């Protein structure tokens, strides 16, 4: 019997190619055109997106990207490439490709890269620890479209999420412990997850339950009392209600109530990006301190740390 050759596809959201209005506009147009992200009627959404949102948001968002841009590109791209390279070194006999739902490198280029290595089985690992239709679902949709155009289709193992994976929880816990050791134990550990519209959850997306699972498991691993750990949701967009409580409003409230020291972690982000480095580490720090808080630290994402790479290797091993 011929031995199966397996490849690994690491999938993430994507990023603009440059911190310029033009590049950001191209990226946002692709991102906000996906029905998994915004499912508003196209008759209403297209004019709003093209006539208002893209012209107004692109220059502002480009400035935010410029504030966190790294020598090798956006933080998400730099850390994602590091993850790909480190996992390939950890699994030298297994091709590892990186693909993004939006922007470059595309998911299609990642699939083609693996097929060029003559793999007949692909393990797809969306780097979203907590499932959501708007993230993991978008990877699934695009993968299906890509394979629909192929004459030969490899076997596919698709990892839905890993919200309560033991290695993942331990890696988070060790990162928190290191931060506590460096900065002192805070009055509160705030876990901020990317939000989604409340309507998506009402219609069946189990994302909030998966976030609660991670929060519960992490608090347990740390041995922290429930009242010392709080879960919030960030990065809301548009006018409809999103998952609550909102991170920025919660930080303002906590500062006003006299909570002095907070540390913030974003467990749903496998790699640091604009939403963590600018929104959480900078904007929300100003919100908390401006409301009366005294001390605020952001705990970095797991990025390409050895513990994170080992977690990925162990996670995909069950599907190889």
Curated annotation (Swiss-Prot):
EC number: 4.98.1.1
Chief location of this protein within or outside the cell: cytoplasm
Places the protein is found: Cytoplasm
GO MF term set: ferrochelatase activity; metal ion binding
Transmembrane segments: none
Catalysed conversion reaction: heme b + 2 H(+) = protoporphyrin IX + Fe(2+)
Protein's pathway: Porphyrin-containing compound metabolism; protoheme biosynthesis; protoheme from protoporphyrin-IX: step 1/1
PROSITE patterns the record matches: FERROCHELATASE
Any single Pfam family the record assigns to this protein: Ferrochelatase
Keyword terms: Cytoplasm, Heme biosynthesis, Iron, Lyase, Metal-binding, Porphyrin biosynthesis
Taxonomic superkingdom: Bacteria
Record keyword Cytoplasm present: yes
GO biological process: heme biosynthetic process
Binding residues annotated for Fe cation, in chain numbering: 194, 275
Annotated GO CC locations: cytoplasm
Quaternary structure annotation from Swiss-Prot or TrEMBL: Monomer.
HAMAP family hit by this protein: Ferrochelatase
Function, in words: Catalyzes the ferrous insertion into protoporphyrin IX.
NCBIfam families: hemH
Protein family membership: Belongs to the ferrochelatase family.
Protein name (Swiss-Prot/TrEMBL): Ferrochelatase
Organism of derivation: Escherichia coli O157:H7
Higher taxonomy: Bacteria, Pseudomonadati, Pseudomonadota, Gammaproteobacteria, Enterobacterales
Gene: hemH
């Amino acid at each position: 019997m011929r031995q199966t050759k397996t490849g690994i596809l690491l999938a993430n959201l994507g990023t603009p190619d440059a911190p310029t209005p033009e590049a950001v506009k191209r990226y946002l147009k692709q991102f906000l055109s996906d029905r998994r992200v915004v499912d508003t009627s196209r008759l209403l959404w297209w004019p709003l997106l093209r006539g208002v949102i893209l012209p107004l948001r692109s220059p502002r968002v480009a400035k935010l990207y410029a504030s966190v841009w790294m020598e090798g590109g956006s933080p998400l791209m730099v850390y994602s490439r590091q993850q790909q390279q480190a996992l390939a070194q950890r699994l030298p006999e297994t091709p590892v490709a990186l693909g993004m739902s939006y922007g470059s490198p595309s998911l299609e280029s990642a699939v083609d890269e693996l097929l060029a290595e003559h793999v007949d089985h692909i393990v797809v690992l969306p780097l979203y620890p907590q499932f959501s239709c708007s993230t993991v679902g978008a990877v699934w949709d695009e993968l299906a479209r890509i394979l629909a155009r192929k004459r030969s289709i490899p076997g596919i193992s698709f990892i839905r999420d890993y919200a309560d994976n033991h290695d993942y929880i331990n890696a988070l816990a060790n990162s928190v412990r290191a931060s506590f050791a460096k900065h002192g134990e805070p009055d509160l550990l705030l876990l901020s997850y990317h939000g989604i519209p409340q309507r998506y959850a009402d219609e069946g997306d189990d994302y909030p339950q998966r976030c609660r699972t991670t929060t519960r498991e992490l608090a347990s691993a740390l041995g922290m009392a429930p009242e010392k750990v709080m879960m919030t949701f960030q990065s809301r967009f548009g006018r409809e209600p999103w998952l609550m409580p909102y991170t920025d409003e919660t930080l303002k409230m906590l500062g006003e109530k006299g909570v002095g020291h907070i540390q913030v972690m974003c467990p749903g982000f496998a790699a640091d990006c604009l939403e963590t480095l600018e929104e959480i580490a900078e904007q929300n720090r100003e919100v908390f301190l401006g409301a009366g808080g005294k001390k605020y630290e952001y705990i970095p994402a797991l990025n390409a740390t050895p513990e994170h790479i080992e977690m990925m290797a162990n996670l995909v091993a069950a599907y190889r």
